[in-house]
Amino acid sequence: APSSGFFGTR
């Protein structure tokens, strides 16, 4: 799951 929006998944 994303930690902070979209780029949180990278």
From Swiss-Prot:
**Residues with PTM Arginine amide:** R10
Q: Which GO terms describe its cellular component?
A: extracellular region
Q: Where in the cell is it found?
A: Secreted
Q: Does the keyword Secreted apply?
A: yes
Q: Which domain of life is it from?
A: Eukaryota
Q: Name one GO biological process term.
A: neuropeptide signaling pathway
Q: List the disulfide bonds.
A: none
Q: Which UniProt keywords apply?
A: Amidation, Neuropeptide, Secreted
Work out whether the entry's keyword set contains Secreted: yes
Q: In which tissues is it expressed?
A: Expressed in the antennal lobe (at protein level).
Name of the featured protein: Tachykinin-related peptide 3
What is the originating organism of this protein?
A: Oncopeltus fasciatus (Large milkweed bug)
